[in-house]
Each structure stands twice: as C-alpha cells, then as structure tokens.
Design a protein with these regions (language model features):
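Conserved ankyrin/ankyrin-like repeat signature
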Residues: 30, 65, 98-99, 134-135, ...
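Alpha-helix initiation and capping sites
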Residues: 12, 27-28, 40-44, 59-62, ...
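Ankyrin-repeat and related helical/solenoid repeat scaffolds used for protein-protein interactions
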Residues: 116-141, 145-148, 235-260
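Intrinsically disordered, low-complexity regulatory segments in ankyrin-centric signaling systems
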Residues: 1-38, 42-59, 67, 171, ...
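Ankyrin repeat domain, specifically the short helix-to-loop turn at the C-terminus of the second helix
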Residues: 35-40, 67-75, 101-109, 137-145, ...
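Ankyrin-repeat boundary/"N-cap" motif
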Residues: 12-19, 43-56, 79-86, 113-126, ...
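Ankyrin repeat A-helix N-terminal signature
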Residues: 21-26, 53-61, 89-96, 124-131, ...
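Leucine-rich solenoid repeat scaffolds
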Residues: 146-191, 245, 249, 257, ...
Length: 292
C-alpha cells in the first residue's frame, strides 16, 4: 500500500510539472483538461497557489495563463510566506509587464511590501528603464501610493516614502520618474488626492465591463440603483469573470469604504471566495491604518 502511495505521489508530481510547463507557455486548453480531471486548480502548495508558482520566473510566463487562472477563480491577491502576492512576483525586476497589468486589474495591491520591504510593485515600476509612463499611470490609477510609509529593516533608504526616496536619490535611473512624480505631487497638493484618479478613471475600465461595472468604478450609488431598477443583472461578469460587486471590491480603497458598504447591500448575491479574499484584505488595511 505504501508503494502505491509513493507511485501516486510521483505521478502527481510529474503531472504538476507538466501543467507548470503548459501554463508557462500559455497552453491553457491542455492544462485545463488536466485540471478538469486530475488536479485541483485551487490547491495551495505550501503558501503558493498556481499564480505564484508560474510567476517564480516571471519573464517567460505567458500572460494568457494569468488571465485563465484568475477566470477560474484562483486567488490573485493571496500572500505567501514572504508576504508576496502574485503581482509582487510578476514585477520582480519589472520582468512581466503584461502579467502585471492583468493582476493589477484583478485587484493586485501595488503597494504591498514583502517581509524585507524590497519587493514593492510600485517601486519596481519606478525603477524600470526605460521609464514606462503608461504603466506608472496605470499603477497610480489602481491605488499606487507614493506617500505610503514602510517600516524598513537593514540597509537604510533615503526618504520615508517612495516620493521622497526618488527625489532624494538623484540618480540618472530616476530622472524621468522623478520629474513625472514631481508634477504628480504638485497636482495632488493643488487639487487633492482624487484629482489623478478622476483624471485617469478610464484606466479602470475594460471593454468587457457592463454599465453596472462602470457604475461601481465611479462608486455611483444612484446610477447603480437606477440600473438595477431597469433590470440589469447584478451577476453579469466581465473579462476576468468578476461580477460588479467583485469589481468594486477589487478597486476599493479605505476612502471608498462607506460607498462600498452601500454597494454591497445593493449587489450582494452570496459570498464567493473572491469576495472573502478582498474583505480579508480590507480588514488588514484597516488594522494597518489604525496603527498610524
């Protein structure tokens, strides 16, 4: 019996290696056949899910597989033993921009720091060379916070936050980023924190988003009520298989909490794993916020 178990373990191990290779190459149809019959796509392996696993070497991971796994309900914001979510792995040295974009739109936290406070997705965007203005604007639109402070250990870094860090480290690497963030900071000081998000709100929208998805992007309670009164389906899904409620959770920040409560009351149709994951994250943010 023990020999049989060992054979089973070896078979499963080889099967996982095969699926890993298929996902790395974007051969999702073949991978799906195996997940449908022999492997659990939602399995947690140690502290990793399949998104973590295929992003260990991010540069050669096909973004099609990232989208496939998210559509299948694999948690895109799960933190591993290093306090890293899939977005952190995707942005390791800025190696997989397309995968990062998908994970960001799936709710990835651009400000999440690993335990060593070295692998922060937003920082990685700012370190990229050549400067990628489009990607930086996308990260800022999805909640990237250049003023967020981190408790650092080990080597000291000039500046208490990303903005100060880049302004104080006057390196050629940061020239374009520094100039962009300097103007960004001026706009925030002049017009307020919501100015940039409102200016670039179109970045939060996708072609497959319904009118109801677009209404939650604006956290527009009156429009949501109107659409529901007109018979819009609260369970309609976008390209990531996100309902309007899950979409709202994925872009929600602490400043939207009151509106989020109202949206939940209007759109709630049963708790899903995605909703649970985002609620846990909001609880963590509230706990972190209360310490300052």
């Amino acid at each position: 019996m023990e020999k049989s178990n060992n054979l089973d373990e070896s078979y499963i191990k080889n099967l996982k290696s095969k699926v890993w290779e298929l996902l790395k190459k974007g051969e999702v149809e073949e991978a799906d056949k195996i997940f449908s019959t022999e492997l659990d796509i939602h399995e947690i392996m140690g502290t990793w899910n399949w998104l973590h696993k295929i992003l260990i070497e991010p540069e050669d991971t096909n973004p099609i597989s990232i989208e496939y796994l998210i559509k299948k309900g694999v948690n895109p914001i799960l933190k591993d033993e290093y306090n890293m979510a899939p977005l952190n792995w995707a942005m390791g040295n800025g190696k997989n921009i397309e995968a990062a974009k998908i994970l960001l739109k799936a709710g990835g936290d651009p400000n999440l720091a690993d335990k060593g406070v070295r692998e922060i997705p937003l920082y990685k965007v700012c370190y990229m060379k050549p400067f990628n203005k489009e990607l930086l604007e996308l990260f800022l639109a999805y909640g990237g916070d250049i003023y967020k402070e981190y408790k650092r250990y080990g080597t000291a870094i000039l500046g208490k936050n990303l903005y100060e860090h880049i302004q104080n480290n006057r390196l050629a690497l940061f020239k374009d980023t520094g100039e962009y963030l300097f103007e960004y900071n001026k706009d925030i000081e002049k017009y307020g924190k919501d100015y940039f998000i409102n200016k670039h709100k179109s970045l939060l929208k996708d072609e497959a988003d319904s009118l109801l998805h677009e209404a939650v992007i604006d956290f527009d309670i009156l429009k949501i009520k109107k659409l529901l009164d007109e018979g819009y389906d609260k369970n309609i899904k976008n390209f990531l298989n996100y309902t309007p409620l899950v979409k709202a959770f994925s872009i929600c920040r602490l400043e939207n909490l009151q509106a989020m409560v109202e949206i939940s009351d209007l759109l709630y149709a049963g708790t899903t794993d995605s909703i649970k994951a985002f609620i846990i994250r909001l609880d963590e943010w509230l706990d972190e916020y209360s310490k300052f």
